[in-house]
From Swiss-Prot:
Lineage: Eukaryota, Metazoa, Chordata, Craniata, Vertebrata
Biased composition (Low complexity): 41-51, 63-80, 179-220, 874-888
Disulfide bonds: C1160-C1210
Role description: Major component of the vertebrate myofibrillar M band. Binds myosin, titin, and light meromyosin. This binding is dose dependent.
Compositionally biased tracts (Polar residues): 221-233, 889-902
Subcellular location: Cytoplasm, Myofibril, Sarcomere, M line
The name this protein goes by in its record: Myomesin-1
Biological source species: Homo sapiens (Human)
GO terms assigned for molecular function: identical protein binding; kinase binding; protein homodimerization activity; structural constituent of muscle
Residue(s) carrying Phosphoserine: S113, S883, S887, S1054
Amino acid sequence: MSLPFYQRCHQHYDLSYRNKDVRSTVSHYQREKKRSAVYTQGSTAYSSRSSAAHRRESEAFRRASASSSQQQASQHALSSEVSRKAASAYDYGSSHGLTDSSLLLDDYSSKLSPKPKRAKHSLLSGEEKENLPSDYMVPIFSGRQKHVSGITDTEEERIKEAAAYIAQRNLLASEEGITTSKQSTASKQTTASKQSTASKQSTASKQSTASRQSTASRQSVVSKQATSALQQEETSEKKSRKVVIREKAERLSLRKTLEETETYHAKLNEDHLLHAPEFIIKPRSHTVWEKENVKLHCSIAGWPEPRVTWYKNQVPINVHANPGKYIIESRYGMHTLEINGCDFEDTAQYRASAMNVKGELSAYASVVVKRYKGEFDETRFHAGASTMPLSFGVTPYGYASRFEIHFDDKFDVSFGREGETMSLGCRVVITPEIKHFQPEIQWYRNGVPLSPSKWVQTLWSGERATLTFSHLNKEDEGLYTIRVRMGEYYEQYSAYVFVRDADAEIEGAPAAPLDVKCLEANKDYIIISWKQPAVDGGSPILGYFIDKCEVGTDSWSQCNDTPVKFARFPVTGLIEGRSYIFRVRAVNKMGIGFPSRVSEPVAALDPAEKARLKSRPSAPWTGQIIVTEEEPSEGIVPGPPTDLSVTEATRSYVVLSWKPPGQRGHEGIMYFVEKCEAGTENWQRVNTELPVKSPRFALFDLAEGKSYCFRVRCSNSAGVGEPSEATEVTVVGDKLDIPKAPGKIIPSRNTDTSVVVSWEESKDAKELVGYYIEASVAGSGKWEPCNNNPVKGSRFTCHGLVTGQSYIFRVRAVNAAGLSEYSQDSEAIEVKAAIGGGVSPDVCPALSDEPGGLTASRGRVHEASPPTFQKDALLGSKPNKPSLPSSSQNLGQTEVSKVSETVQEELTPPPQKAAPQGKSKSDPLKKKTDRAPPSPPCDITCLESFRDSMVLGWKQPDKIGGAEITGYYVNYREVIDGVPGKWREANVKAVSEEAYKISNLKENMVYQFQVAAMNMAGLGAPSAVSECFKCEEWTIAVPGPPHSLKCSEVRKDSLVLQWKPPVHSGRTPVTGYFVDLKEAKAKEDQWRGLNEAAIKNVYLKVRGLKEGVSYVFRVRAINQAGVGKPSDLAGPVVAETRPGTKEVVVNVDDDGVISLNFECDKMTPKSEFSWSKDYVSTEDSPRLEVESKGNKTKMTFKDLGMDDLGIYSCDVTDTDGIASSYLIDEEELKRLLALSHEHKFPTVPVKSELAVEILEKGQVRFWMQAEKLSGNAKVNYIFNEKEIFEGPKYKMHIDRNTGIIEMFMEKLQDEDEGTYTFQLQDGKATNHSTVVLVGDVFKKLQKEAEFQRQEWIRKQGPHFVEYLSWEVTGECNVLLKCKVANIKKETHIVWYKDEREISVDEKHDFKDGICTLLITEFSKKDAGIYEVILKDDRGKDKSRLKLVDEAFKELMMEVCKKIALSATDLKIQSTAEGIQLYSFVTYYVEDLKVNWSHNGSAIRYSDRVKTGVTGEQIWLQINEPTPNDKGKYVMELFDGKTGHQKTVDLSGQAYDEAYAEFQRLKQAAIAEKNRARVLGGLPDVVTIQEGKALNLTCNVWGDPPPEVSWLKNEKALASDDHCNLKFEAGRTAYFTINGVSTADSGKYGLVVKNKYGSETSDFTVSVFIPEEEARMAALESLKGGKKAK
């Protein structure tokens, strides 16, 4: 083998071992040919050696040599597999024809040893072996990572696989049943002596069988002494035919086994497959025009797979030095070098070098670049001085001179507005400066090189590079990179440019679209695409208008009448051969916004014609023209087009494409497009007026949602051809869906004016254009766009934010179909620089199409290594990509990348530094203000002292400086006679604990100490010098003091005290601790213990503190010897709960995940959360997961169980002791697990379970009600374990607002008996409810359903809503009532009692449909059967009420109850006979029982005491009352069920007054009885004729007998002859007038009188004259009157 030239002359970058490396490798390759038999271990050597071994073995057996036996035993000692491997070639040795008996065969297993394959120690000289480390293997070739191909990687792969390969092969071999054993010669001789004349073959067969079973040894060593004779006794035996046949069969079996074994081992021998590279297809030379692309291809075979390196003029091509210039690919053995945009410098000889472990092979090809028509590319030269770009290591100072490139006055993150101008620039300083040689400067936007245009211009003044925007548009937004290349070195710098929308002319109008491009151009139409704007003006965008303008004119015309929403549109109506430009405007309800930037000019040409116009003559020119004349074939009708398909379909248009027919004649053809609705054969021609000239066509005015088929016909002057095959059915509508909203918006701090926002990309999004990010000040509700050009990826840096302000963010995705819904708002984040000032200068920032790391470049020069130019690579790189090589490495030392890696896969951005907006990025060494070294530790104490060492302890610094403390450094010094000595370092490596053991001290020497803390910002100031401590052996038996006391979770009545065990535990281990406390101002004798028994924990929750009191604490350790010295004091600590203090809360999310959450509003930028369990850090706990964001932290339990019981606490660093804890005991564990299960397997809450009810028509309603249901809730209806669906029998309904779920059945039949179940599913939550309808339950329900059905039929006519019933009114009357419905005037309502009509309701104009019959003073005579009948032409209904027997009794009891309740209170009334107690009721019936009691005893009725009812009065009469009648009287009215009582107290004043009244009435009665009175006989008026006699008789009474006198006209009348007055026997008075005259007329009165009283009885006497006498008297009086005149 030979090394390639460039490897032999290569200068290794590591000079410390480069010479040894190369010399060893060269030596190895020089010896490789000589030892090829040893190294390759090919199958040929194997077979030849096996043959020779077999022949030597056979000869040895025949001669039976004892010396050979000894030699063979020696050979077994050297290689355990020799004899068996030698015999494995029994039948195949002679066929190979090898007779070299001296051939040396090495053990194959040693050849597969990994160490010789890896290190090749046997190939090195003794000096080289001494210089080599034992574990270092010399590489065959050392080069830069990933950029040099060769033997290195192949060897490394073989080294790594060697051990595993041997193990695998041995395993496979062992599975074949092969064993390793050593067999002595004697055993062989014994075996041979027992065999027949075929013993030689039998012995060989056995040995061959052993060889077939071995895979660990395939070679043997056969010495020349093997030919010596063996002393062996031969015996002859007669063999039967059966034995011979068996032996022959064994030989045939052995032969087959050996063939299989050799084939198996040939497969295991990988060296048999090795072969050098071989070019199957070599690269071809090319001659191309300038600015065209060229590809060089080659195909290479070889094993291991060769590495391919491409060279240009013998210099390796670095794809990163010229990004986008070269693309190297390797796929399936085909290797390609693509050169883009060839120029004159690309004219060169190109070489493809293929290399593997077997060698190297090259193939050459030349590329010649010609300039077309002598055009001169002026863009290759810069304005100003003459420039000469440096490339491929050629510089004025020779090969690979080093250049230092620096940027000064760099441009920062910039903000512009549409329509404005902007310039980006920086000053470029290159050292050393070379005359006439200028750097190559290139500008990039999002990784795409920029070329000068009317929108952007570049300028290089010799010192400053400038990029100028003449008219900003949103298309100009992106990451801008300036890349300066000088020779093989380069440097670059990037910053982002944001372009805001211009102020709208119409308030609320949308912003302008962007990126208007031509997707496809044809002679009939051009498809235009664009991107939707981020700002819609406050109302949704209704669509877009597309405008076109012919190049050379200023006349814009609108292409569509109605706005289109899809961001693609085919513009038709174009004139073939003319060029157009386009623009797009968005419209919403407020108006039309600004137009977009115009597109690039596009010509309306057939693609083939366009390609013909752009084509150039092929090279070289031959000067020959061959013309073939054919007879024209006229009149050929073209055939049908082929490959007709729908290439694009939206709701607005459908695009068809096809291929021209093969048979079309010599003239041009045109096309007619036809359509028909799916399922019909009604074909309609779409372009009826003008045929289509191009094989593509866009159809408009199709009905959205309908399905169509299409076909195309060709036509020419000969006619219209047959139609093509119709397309498949196409539904008109947008095939592209609007993307889903992104998720998991996570903001993180970056700088003082920027925040990095990351998100989870939209799922299943197709043709995604990018994302828009919006920001809003928390609580304002006003959103502003962070980018106006969609960005790809899932990360973006939002700039231009206000420092210290809190922002929330949201993201939406966009594709051609539209913009997605907004994502959920992120958590609020305060804008401030992260620790370290944002992106670390040593870590490559993650960039994407939303470039998040807008950073300055590092302060050193890069060589031509991976740049940030391909957009996907630049903007999609990750932070963990390898950093770029330093500037000390040159191009010649780089490896050529693996051919399968393209530029797009390899390009990575250089490490850069982040700079806040508004500050120069040119000062990378400026100190960060948000982090600082920690303050000094304090309270240094000696924890334990030994004879020559001491253990120190100290307290953590009060201020940690914004980052966690990473360690401490301890210094000490001796103090001799009070004079301190020189400080010395106690530890070189920082210690992480607040305790450290300092060794190698001097016994009885006094020392002082100081401690300094360190964090990522640096080493802090040292602490104050400690007290003097004497280094001496502590011999005390009790433990030392605990240390590192800390108070946390301080509340108004409690706190947690923590400490660390003492370093010195005494003579026995520490068994516990005692904790003491006292008030800070109290005296030393005020210490009191908190625990009576020692506690084993190193923490204690102190309770019972007084709010506002300051306390100090100390801890003492105890062991078997006693209690040790108290610790240093902890505190003072004030017992108070500070405002805003929050506690750890437990949360169980929807997935059942249990977590502890804590929030702190008083965090500083340097604060962090620290979780612990039982006050031991949980940082490495596999059962817990901690996540912190902003001022919130969450600790999640992966699998909460008994192992997780304990106290969980969270401390906030860099605060004044903010902490909180949460206890999880067994009860809390059970509660949380139950809650977790409920959340993990949620159930839909149910208000009411599944129930059944019968509706009015006999329908059956199954229903249940859930607490709430979302719009996605589903219900499965199950009957007897089978799902039922809506149909004629079942009607289902779900009311998601009320949660009611219903199923209706018209009728219950016998087959409907069974179990009904409703299964609910709402998201993850499920539930079910079941009702069982079997047996009596089902029959009862079925009967009720039938009854309700009949009831519904009944209710179609006049019917009773409420049947006849009774009610007792307040007046104790009985009211019979019923409620009727559906009646009209013609309806008859008749009342019956005992089938006798008692009432007819002729006028039933009642509002409520109530019919009543009132029965007053209801009694037994009213008992009977009452009935009401409703009847009209629609039907009849009746209601019957039985008021007999028990029903009558029940009614009477209710009547009696009402009467009893109507009773008035008992009153007392005196009578002449005695005293009466009484009460009034509404009316009285006999069924109402009345009972009286006196002083709790029932009254025995007699003549003196009796009761009765008079009308409505119920009374108790007590005649001639005595004092014994005093007391409480109760009247009880019993209605048949209940007694109703009325009471009165007849005692005291009530009795006295009643009794006095009784006496008065009694006397009045006596007087009344004996009073004089007229008993009768005198009329009221007496009319008597004059002259008659009047006789009147009158009876009088009185005791004593009364005196009698008469009156006439109120005057006393005396008895005389005319008027005779008599009084006889004291009882009778006579009144007589004889000869009554008119003078006797008048009023008379009889007056009787005795001592008890008097009485007057009046009567009137009227005397009249007869008629004749009266007439005469009248005449006489008349006459007398005339005379008087």
